[in-house]
Curated annotation (Swiss-Prot):
This is Cytochrome c oxidase subunit 1. SUPFAM superfamilies: Cytochrome c oxidase subunit I-like (SSF81442). It comes from Rhizobium leguminosarum. GO terms for biological process: electron transport coupled proton transport; oxidative phosphorylation; respiratory electron transport chain. GO terms for cellular component: plasma membrane; respiratory chain complex IV. InterPro entries: Cyt_c_oxase-like_su1_dom, Cyt_c_oxase-like_su1_sf, Cyt_C_Oxase_1, Cyt_c_Oxase_su1_BS, Cyt_c_oxase_su1_dom, Cyt_c_oxidase_su1_bac. Cu cation binds at residues 265, 269, 314-315. The gene is ctaD.
């Protein structure tokens, strides 16, 4: 048996070598590390496009009056595309597709993912999906104007009768394909984690990042089919005369909102849970301590995932639901703060008494804890139906979810990037450049989004191209912040270029005694086929 395993290993090595020598190696590779790298490159490209759109939005809002988007529908298209791109083509491919594919098999001691060829198509569906979304901006949406400008939520009737052209149809197909990609990926992750752990690695010994990916995969598997159903009904309403969401045919536009948010709320937890997992590893590594309350951390994530499915209507307080219904959703939403608080305090307890090293990944992780907490506090404010009466669809909501996404998920992605970059590439980045990137984006995004709380409380509504002069001051501050953040993206790309240009080699484990998971026992970068003899976990 040992001989055959070794022989198989040699054969696999040769195949892996050919794969990279061949010009189509990247395209056809079924290796989880190659696919993870493709996901990360795709996420960076999509992120730059999405960030460019947000810069255009903030440039327009810098001063009152319509300045750049003289075709005002185009502004709505930018807002819509920015949202869809950042969620479906940047955060999800980076966290789940990128870091998930790269490190989940390494962490659990698996030779690869359970279904490597399915993994390949999970990735390649995404460029197709992205292409459809970009195509939608070049065909008619509203009469006489190109592109889908219904918001990333695509609420009816704006996305049905409000957009008679084919743009929204293309956007719907784009979401279908992105959803198919995520469902296939989720099946792959669940199977891999349940069936391919190294001998001795029970579920309760599994690294927290692996747990976060498992829970995220279940959320994807349960929520995406609901989105698929909703947008398919929207498609038939638009093209085939059905009236699922059209009152004149006995339909209900609120049904769309319920279906959408039944997907949409688990989705925002899908966007942050893998980040929780990454942050746990980074805090533990740079505090030189095991995570405080491991089991509590696992079940807190599971509780967040479960509760995420029963709070969706807190996005809909103003649609006229029954008061008892609203009371339920207020209470359920606030209960999610409990497991989230367990995680925050466990991270702080992990650092307590630790030998903390403020390396770049640790800076991102510390900023994540602070800024995610700010986003959580404004979330508790918005959970109150009575307050949401006033704050719904104002910039207060924009500030809230950008604090948990732009200053939460993105900070977690960058934390993971700087933490694992030496392992993925075999090179060390320039610490000074990396810290400059951190401080620049930290100042930038806080300048953008903190003042937006004030705008929201003052009553400035979201998704408008123009605003009364009274809101000019904080909008100027916000837009200046977006220029700083935009520059930080360029610095990040230069930082990556610099690391590959300088070629500073790195050992198996650049982080020292704090890094205890299996990937740090492998060379940097790992061989094409790791774990030919499965590791045994004690």
């Amino acid at each position: 048996m040992a001989t055959s395993a070794a022989a198989h290993g040699e054969h696999a090595e040769d195949h892996g070598h050919d794969e990279h020598a061949h010009p189509t190696g990247w395209r056809r590779s079924t290796n989880h590390k190659d696919i993870g790298t493709l996901y990360l490159i795709f996420a960076i490209i999509a992120g730059v496009i999405g960030a460019a759109m947000s810069l255009a939005i903030r440039a327009e809002l810098m001063y009152p009056g319509v300045e750049y988007f003289h075709n005002t529908h185009l502004y709505n298209v930018f807002v819509t595309s920015h949202g869809v791109i950042m969620i479906f083509f940047m955060v999800m491919p980076a966290m789940i597709g990128g870091f998930g594919n790269w490190f989940l098999p390494l962490m659990i001691g698996a030779p690869d993912m359970a279904f490597p060829r399915m993994n390949n198509i999970s990735f390649w569906l995404l460029p197709a999906s992205f292409g459809l979304l970009l195509m939608s901006t070049f065909v008619e949406g509203e009469p006489g104007a190109n592109g889908a400008g219904a918001g990333w939520t695509m609420y009816v009737p704006l996305s049905s009768s409000g957009h008679p052209g084919p743009a929204v149809d293309l956007a719907i197909f784009s979401l279908h394909i992105a959803g198919a990609s995520s469902i296939l990926g989720a099946i792959n992750f669940i199977t891999t984690i349940l069936n391919m752990r190294a001998p001795g690695m029970t579920l309760h010994k599994m690294p927290l990042f692996a747990w976060s990916v498992l829970i995220t995969a279940f959320l994807l598997l349960l929520s995406l089919p609901v989105l698929a159903g909703a947008i398919t009904m929207l498609l038939t309403d638009r093209n085939f005369g059905t009236t699922f969401f059209a009152p004149e045919g006995g339909g209900d536009p609120l049904l769309y909102q319920h279906l959408f948010w039944f997907f949409g709320h688990p989705e925002v937890y899908i966007l942050i849970l893998p980040g929780f997992g990454m942050i746990s590893h980074i805090i533990s590594t740079f505090s030189r301590k095991p995570v405080f309350g491991y089991i509590g951390m696992v079940y807190a994530m599971a509780a967040i995932g479960g509760l995420g499915f029963v709070v969706w209507a807190h996005h809909m307080y103003i649609v006229g639901m029954d008061l008892d219904t609203e009371a339920y959703f207020v209470s359920a939403t606030m209960i999610i703060a409990v497991p989230t608080g367990i995680k925050i305090f466990s991270w702080i307890a992990t650092m307590w008494g630790g030998s903390i090293e403020f390396a770049t990944p640790m800076l991102w992780a510390l900023a994540f804890i602070f800024l995610f907490t700010v986003g959580g506090v404004t979330g508790v404010v918005l959970a109150n139906a009575s307050l949401d009466r006033v704050l719904h669809d104002t910039y207060y909501v924009v500030a809230h979810f950008h604090y948990v996404l732009s200053l939460g998920a993105i900070f977690a992605i960058f934390a993971g990037w700087y933490y694992w970059f030496p392992k993925m590439s075999g090179y060390m980045y320039n610490e000074t450049l990396a810290e400059a990137h951190f401080w620049l984006i930290f100042i930038g995004v806080n300048l953008i989004f903190f003042p937006e709380h004030f705008l929201g409380i003052s009553g400035m509504p979201r998704r408008y191209i123009d605003y009364p002069d009274a809101f000019a001051g904080w909008n100027l501050v916000s837009s200046i912040g977006s220029y700083i953040s935009g520059f930080s993206v360029l610095l990040f790309i230069y930082c990556v270029y610099d690391a590959f240009a300088k070629n500073v080699p790195v050992g198996d484990n650049p982080w020292g005694a704090g890094a205890t998971t299996l990937e740090w026992t492998l060379p940097s970068p790992p061989p094409v086929h790791e774990f030919e003899v499965l590791p045994r976990v004690e």
